[in-house]
Structure formats: C-alpha cells, structure tokens
C-alpha cells in the first residue's frame, strides 16, 4: 500500500472562496499535500473548465457541495451538477449514488455564534436519510465559528485561528459509531471548509480560513493499492477507490504529521 495525504472540502472563486484553483493548488504543494478535492457550492464549473489535473505537482480533483441553507452534502466523483434539495436531501443522496459518486454529510452539528455571520448555522437536519457514504466528523470552520463566544475571543481567534481547533465533533462521532455498529459501510471524513476569505478588522486585512493554514490542519490520508502515476484518470480512480473502501484516516497534521499512522 502507498500512503498519500490530501485535503477535501475547499472553496475557490467558483463559489465563495477567495482563491483561484491554481493558487489553491500551489498552496497545497507548499503544504506537502498529494491531492486536493475542490467542493464549490452548487456548481462543477472547475471541472467543466478543465481545472482537474496535476497543478504545481498536486492532483486537483473537482467535486461540489450541494444545498445552501441546511443539509449540506459533499458530492465527490460526480460528472453532472447535483441539484439542491434542502427539503428532501434523500433526493440529493440518490442522485449522487446514481452517478456512482461519493456522498458525505457535511458539518452536521453547529452551534453558531452571534459574532460570526449573525449566528447562522448550516446543520444537517434530516437523519431519516440512508445510503450516504460518509459523515464529516471534523470541520475546521464550524469549530472556529462555534468558538467565537465573545467579542474578545472572536478577535483572539481571528489572529490565532488554530486556537479554535479542538477535536472531532462528539455528536457526529456518536452517530457514526451507531451506524457502523449496525453494520453500515459509512466512513469518517474531515476537512477545513477552507475559503481563503479576506475581511477587515479595523484597518487590518485578515484572512479567514487561509489555504496555507488549512492545508496543515484536518487532512485525509489514504492507502492506495498502486503508486500514483501522474495520469489524471488513473490517479483519480486510485484516490476515489481508497475513499470508497475506507482505506483512509483523518488527522490534524498541524502540530505533528500523522504520516505512517497505518
């Protein structure tokens, strides 16, 4: 088996992210990643404009994030845009499965903060669904938002963003444990939800979830049966096969790399 380190749940200028795909790829290379999966909101523009492939030495793949207000769902390895359906997310799940993709319930539990987007949350609300492949048990931007519990702490976190990162979401872990105990083939995922947005704090420009930081945080490591070859199609298949079969783990690589864990 060959170990490769990647990062999923990333937004670019094709939706509400601050970076172009080529800029994001360059940051991923600097962080020592082997692959990234861009998941812009409600579109596959990057895929259809030929952004997939090796850029700056890193394998760039394009998926998408479906739904806007709630029931966010990551759709990986799909060719056609999956339509939003927040009121019936099972329809979204079924469409990803029809395309033989990988579907992941994203940031299912959020508390929100009145100091960040006026308390908005994007939780998963329908747990009667079935046939999804994964649950995002660790999402950096969700934890960052939830930790903004006061004005002073919010300012502190803006300038010390890693302080908002603690551990995987216990509620999401509990649900994953319950489903796996029932014999369901559902795997753990994690990501930063990187947007690379620039805001102003007084006169100072500050980046929220900068790519160069996020790519050292919640990464996903896979075990591939074959060495990545540099061929886009072959290597995509290797990465997605590993994810589908659960030959992967997630880890915070900020303080110490988890390379070689398995």
Regions of interest found by a model, annotated:
Residues 156-160:
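Flexible glycine/proline-enriched surface loops and loop-helix/loop-strand junctions
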Residues 1-3, 182-188, 192-262:
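C-terminal functional module detector
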Residues 1-153, 166-182, 191:
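A metal-dependent hydrolase metal-coordination microenvironment
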